[in-house]
Amino acid sequence: MTDQTTRLPVRRALISVSDKTGVVDFARELAALGVEILSTGGTFKLLREHGVDAVEVADYTGFPEMMDGRVKTLHPKIHGGILGRRDLDAAVMAEHGIQPIDLVAVNLYPFAATVARPGCTLAEAIENIDIGGPTMVRSAAKNHKDVAIVVNAADYAGVLESLKNGGLTYAQRFDLALRAFEHTAAYDGMIANYLGTIDQGAETLTTEGRAAFPRTFNSQFVKAQDMRYGENPHQQAAFYVETSPAEASVATARQLQGKELSYNNVADTDAALECVKSFVKPACVIVKHANPCGVAVVPEDEGGIRKAYDLAYATDSESAFGGIIAFNRELDGATARAIVERQFVEVIIAPSVSAEAREAVAAKANVRLLECGQWPAERADGLDFKRVNGGLLVQSRDIGMIAEADLKVVTRRAPTEREIHDLIFAWKVAKFVKSNAIVYARNRQTIGVGAGQMSRVNSARIAAIKAEHAGLEVAGAVMASDAFFPFRDGIDNAAKAGITAVIQPGGSMRDNEVIAAADEAGMAMVFTGMRHFRH
């Protein structure tokens, strides 16, 4: 059994990096510890320019770099020195003049950055597929019993500290090896994803000409947290995050206080945060079981998020119990105090949290308080996934949204300016409600939400019931539907409840009947031409 604590010193290191962050200082410290340094190409030149003594690999092997740098380190003196087992292969290594290499510091050609450049050709992408680098990384990782592999500049300091204390333990080398295999797996996955979108044989194809989805799908996520259980107590669970998230999200959020996030907390917080991101003016979203149960938008000069919270809570105070609350502005002390004094809440998330708000929430030690950072005004493209038994559904994110100019009035009466504002508000909310989704809204406040019903008319009925139960007036309110009305009954029910304007995608075979129902009731109706199913 391998000794987990015995420290192995480093006498010879090979350094060959594309990302040269911190490499000069790292090499200088190694040299100061008496480590002989081998290096290649640009890395060798950089070290020599900064006065770090190093031996160029071409001089060490007696073979020059060739083929425009395609062949640098693919030589038995390099790979024998890395792969050679010190206890079994010493005689063979000595016979062939192969010196052991105890540490390999390598990172790879910037393939992802290359293919992300507009106009990148297939030929350019191919030349940025690293061969020697991954080979050395995998060799060193395989032989981690005797060799340390470093693929991330963030690990330089820790490695140096260990070497100053006598060497790296087996446990450290094993961890570095695991990171190395994770690194090469992600790298190869990127290459496979890219090439899988290429029209075969198109040597001059650019990034813009690629298919939307590759032949095989490769993605890497890093475990951020083991969870007590999953959606239910009998299920095991963990939370994995992207290696480089594109924008502020629940995955990037910093927990300031409270109990550990549960599986359902993460899912519901994501739903709340993604919904509140839809609004430019100060907004509050309250979510329960992944559905918005209260949403409001209030301009800063009319009360901002403090007032928005009151209105969102008023939509459905029963469902808000034990919910998730998200804001698109800094959480202030007054709003935080109102929350903790009024209701039981699982999670509060905002771009930032004031010191006064932190103090207020601290009175409820179990409340999970998250700070996620600010997101850009333009939503980033990305992919959504849904696991099915034996497969994976992949689609582009639903970041589609409409503006007033996109609305098509289909009834005799056009909506008023107030109705238009409320229609667009309700439409943004409906996008985040489970289908079939109906949202009643008035003055940029939800007054009733009907979610997840198998028939659209029942979602409309539930929205009306919710509004009545909350004591909120429906007369003069608007209605949003995430998909078209297949029959006129949803419009008839809304008219009876007092709805005066409707927003929906349109596209039903019975659109004319639905429009006629709206005209009979004196309602305004607009089509968006965009559906927002959410399953």
From Swiss-Prot:
**Does the keyword Transferase belong to this entry?**
yes
Species source reads Azotobacter vinelandii (strain DJ / ATCC BAA-1303)
CDD domains documented for this protein: IMPCH
Q: Which reaction does it catalyse?
A: (6R)-10-formyltetrahydrofolate + 5-amino-1-(5-phospho-beta-D-ribosyl)imidazole-4-carboxamide = 5-formamido-1-(5-phospho-D-ribosyl)imidazole-4-carboxamide + (6S)-5,6,7,8-tetrahydrofolate; IMP + H2O = 5-formamido-1-(5-phospho-D-ribosyl)imidazole-4-carboxamide
Protein name (database record): Bifunctional purine biosynthesis protein PurH
State its Enzyme Commission number(s): 2.1.2.3, 3.5.4.10
- Keywords recorded for this protein, A-Z: Hydrolase, Multifunctional enzyme, Purine biosynthesis, Transferase
MGS-like domain ranges (all copies):
6-151
Q: Which GO terms describe its biological process?
A: 'de novo' IMP biosynthetic process
Q: Which residues form the signal peptide?
A: none
Key word Zinc present in the record?
Answer: no
Query: Domain of life, per the record?
Result: Bacteria
Q: What are its GO cellular component terms?
A: cytosol
Q: Which InterPro entries match?
A: AICAR_Tfase_dup_dom_sf, Cytidine_deaminase-like, MGS-like_dom, MGS-like_dom_sf, PurH-like
Q: Its annotated pathway?
A: Purine metabolism; IMP biosynthesis via de novo pathway; 5-formamido-1-(5-phospho-D-ribosyl)imidazole-4-carboxamide from 5-amino-1-(5-phospho-D-ribosyl)imidazole-4-carboxamide (10-formyl THF route): step 1/1; Purine metabolism; IMP biosynthesis via de novo pathway; IMP from 5-formamido-1-(5-phospho-D-ribosyl)imidazole-4-carboxamide: step 1/1
A Pfam entry, by short name: AICARFT_IMPCHas
Q: What is known of its domains?
A: The IMP cyclohydrolase activity resides in the N-terminal region.
Family assignment from sequence similarity: Belongs to the PurH family.
Gene Ontology MF, one: phosphoribosylaminoimidazolecarboxamide formyltransferase activity
Supply the Gene3D superfamilies for this chain: 3.40.140.20, Methylglyoxal synthase-like domain
